[in-house]
């Protein structure tokens, strides 16, 4: 059932071609079949808006003829080519969303339970927020850390052996004397770090125990409590005294006694107290000649990165004979060779000898498991929410395999977490449209999982909202169905697929922009919300197809964080950490101040007094950042306030006066500014004579001028009492009168 496309002209129109109006299908057919000019114009209007008006009788006849003529069926090649285009159009977005689904499972960008339309997925309440204190966070973390350390120290590895299975062995005619158990020895192999003097990595083998394991037992008749078990203490996994252990492995060694019959007896020793290391080579050779076989297998517990490899569960290990697969210190590879032919893994377990056991990490012998259970990636049949522990629920004490616990867990979760209103399952149909034609319709689905990311939305409204917001490469239209809902899926031609990530990452290494290692700082922006409308109630009408046929575009609410700025001097991208500091702001660091003073000291065509004024003035301009002509009047007054005392103490008043006159010659300051600066300087000088400080100096005096300022006249030791001015040679008393 194809979707009905409504035209924008308000109906199918009138005339003979009214039945084909209302969409683009009838219009294109009318254009192809019409011969007269009136028919062409009528067909065009029909295809565009759905309205039609015959201008002459010839156009009506042409339109009627078009309706009578048989429509040619498209060739099979065109149909197949069109179908290939349909598959290609939907293939790329589907692959993208499948990839994002896997990445979001590993490192999610956001949590679905925090969304407003997914509030039913959030099972937590905010009751604890009333009593929450920031100071309690540290104590909670310390408590959790202490529990983990004590937990890891008390935990030990418990192995329960189900049996040793060797399917190739045929039962002996002497079944009464046939031995029905084998000797299993478990050793903990410690591969230590290689020291400088060592040629290879030192390997230590620590025996953990021997057990008699049943041979080819019938699991239906054997009780679980009768299986032999072995415990490995957690102290064995601590670093040794002489070497730092790199990895830990379990070595299983199964010894099967021989079958050589002599007076009704079977050769082979079953004593558990025999130490393997004390066995003599001659004795081993004799035992092998008698028919004794040894099978070995090795499994890694902790790898070189201290990652746990053996989790709780049931294991079946393929064993290999000692002669065929000698254990060496070289790097091991997984191989399965029988009669010169490589076998698939499942055939190995069906033909070769295997050892079955159950592994648990426990604090005590009857304690629950402490090691984390490996959870597979979520599928469309798995729930995303964690199961809440209810008072009536009883947990089994025995260890369950991962594959068994997964299926039973899902059933209990579905029964507990599914609300009553969703007990009645909805049938969801997905109909894929391409070029306004129905190309494919899926089978009915009884769940509300997203087909692209397998998210369980639980509600039809939440599913449609999720599809619309998270998979915007498609257009989803909701169509009511008596048994549920039909969702029309089409390609969003107006989708903006431009890069929306951090613009700084584009200028880094190739591929860095599309990687995600964690939260990063973005450019700070500010938006003013003038009006925040009230959130509308959830309604299914927002997912219906719009009447005008326009595609609803997702408006970008925030775009300032994607802007990219550049340094004007280096043309490098401005990082978000540098946004708070203006790169154009000319600060005066210490090295720049020293460089400025050094350059002024190198001048040879100015006297010492002018150099001192130039130093003070340049440092003053650099510090406050004066760059415009209209700032010079204020700069002069501020210079007098900050450096007036230095000018007076260093006898630089006449030099400063010449500097002001020079600035006036270049039209930088006015005469009024000169008068104000001189008046301010005179007041400061009068206060200094009275012993009062005019204003505190902002900078300390770096150099004391004991000699003359300009170098014209020399001051003798006899004339120091007069303190003559360096330029005019007038004494202080006459200088006061002039000022």
UniProtKB/Swiss-Prot annotation:
Protein modification: Sumoylated, probably by PIAS2.
Variant or mutagenesis effect after changing residue 86 to A: Fails to interact with JARID2
Site (Breakpoint for translocation to form JAZF1-SUZ12 oncogene): 93-94
Cross-link Glycyl lysine isopeptide (Lys-Gly) (interchain with G-Cter in SUMO), where in sequence: 72-73, 75
GO MF annotation, one: zinc ion binding
Residue ranges of the region described as Interaction with AEBP2 and PHF19: 146-363
Swiss-Prot/TrEMBL induction comment: Expression is induced by E2F1, E2F2 and E2F3.
Glycyl lysine isopeptide (Lys-Gly) (interchain with G-Cter in SUMO2) crosslink, residue number(s): 75, 223, 390
BP-aspect Gene Ontology terms: cell population proliferation; facultative heterochromatin formation; negative regulation of cell differentiation; negative regulation of transcription by RNA polymerase II; oligodendrocyte differentiation; positive regulation of cell population proliferation; random inactivation of X chromosome
One GO CC term, this protein: nucleus
Residue numbers spanned by region VEFS-box: 563-639
Modified residues (Phosphoserine): 20, 541, 546, 583, 726
Tissue: Overexpressed in breast and colon cancer.
Subcellular location: Nucleus
Chain intervals for the UniProt region annotation (Interaction with JARID2 and EPOP): 79-106
Alphabetized UniProt keyword annotations: Chromatin regulator, Chromosomal rearrangement, Disease variant, Intellectual disability, Isopeptide bond, Metal-binding, Nucleus, Phosphoprotein, Proto-oncogene, Repressor, Transcription, Transcription regulation, Ubl conjugation, Zinc, Zinc-finger
Region span, Disordered: 1-23, 378-399, 687-739
Bias (Polar residues): 704-715
Family of this protein: Belongs to the VEFS (VRN2-EMF2-FIS2-SU(Z)12) family.
Note: Under hypoxic conditions, the precursor SUZ12 RNA undergoes regulated trans-splicing with the JAZF1 RNA, resulting in a chimeric isoform which may be protective against apoptosis. The chimeric transcript is characterized by JAZF1 exons 1-3 joined to SUZ12 exon 2-16. The chimeric transcript is expressed primarily in the endometrium from late secretory and early proliferative phases of the menstrual cycle, but not in normal myometrium at any phase of the cycle. Its expression is slightly induced by low levels of progesterone, but suppressed by both estrogen and high levels of progesterone.
Family matches, as PANTHER family: POLYCOMB GROUP PROTEIN, POLYCOMB PROTEIN SUZ12
Subunit structure: Component of the PRC2 complex, which consists of the core subunits EED, EZH1 or EZH2, SUZ12, and RBBP4, and various combinations of accessory subunits including AEBP2, JARID2, PHF19, MTF2 and EPOP. Within the complex, interacts (via C2H2 zinc finger domain) with JARID2 and EPOP; JARID2 and EPOP compete for SUZ12 binding. Also interacts with AEBP2 and PHF19. Forms a monomeric PRC2.2 (class 2) complex consisting of at least SUZ12, RBBP4, AEBP2 and JARID2.
Disease per UniProt entry: A chromosomal aberration involving SUZ12 may be a cause of endometrial stromal tumors. Translocation t(7;17)(p15;q21) with JAZF1. The translocation generates the JAZF1-SUZ12 oncogene consisting of the N-terminus part of JAZF1 and the C-terminus part of SUZ12. It is frequently found in all cases of endometrial stromal tumors, except in endometrial stromal sarcomas, where it is rarer. Imagawa-Matsumoto syndrome: An autosomal dominant syndrome characterized by generalized overgrowth, dysmorphic features, musculoskeletal abnormalities, developmental delay and intellectual disability. Some patients have genitourinary and structural brain abnormalities.
Protein name as it appears in the record: Polycomb protein SUZ12
Organism listed in the record: Homo sapiens
Gene transcribed to yield this protein: SUZ12
